[in-house]
Amino acid sequence: MRLFLSLPVLVVVLAMVLEGPAPAQAAPEISRTFERIPDKLKEFGNTLEDKAREVLETIKQSDIPAKTRNWFSETYNKVKEQLKTAFS
């Protein structure tokens, strides 16, 4: 039953895709596209910057860096003590 329903839907979707864009959806002039590239790149850069700042602030506010630093310090001190006792 599912196959009978999915095949016509698949055929309709495939026909729409192969038909191509409608005339109203045709690509604008290439010069307009090139004119908008710097604006799009600036917008992309701004959103990327904002997201990176949010991530960094989240990391700074969390206690993960402090816990990681403490764990490395403790592990380093343990290894150092073990080496001292082993080679003494």
Swiss-Prot record:
Keywords: Lipid transport, Secreted, Signal, Transport, VLDL. Residues 1-26 form the signal peptide. One of its GO terms (biological process) is negative regulation of cholesterol transport. Gene3D superfamilies: Apolipoprotein C-I. It is found in: Secreted. GO terms for cellular component: high-density lipoprotein particle; very-low-density lipoprotein particle. The keyword Secreted applies. It comes from the Eukaryota. One of its GO terms (molecular function) is fatty acid binding. The keyword Transcription does not apply. Pfam families: ApoC-I (PF04691). Inhibitor of lipoprotein binding to the low density lipoprotein (LDL) receptor, LDL receptor-related protein, and very low density lipoprotein (VLDL) receptor. Associates with high density lipoproteins (HDL) and the triacylglycerol-rich lipoproteins in the plasma and makes up about 10% of the protein of the VLDL and 2% of that of HDL. Appears to interfere directly with fatty acid uptake and is also the major plasma inhibitor of cholesteryl ester transfer protein (CETP). Binds free fatty acids and reduces their intracellular esterification. Belongs to the apolipoprotein C1 family. This is Apolipoprotein C-I. The lineage of its organism: Eukaryota, Metazoa, Chordata, Craniata, Vertebrata.
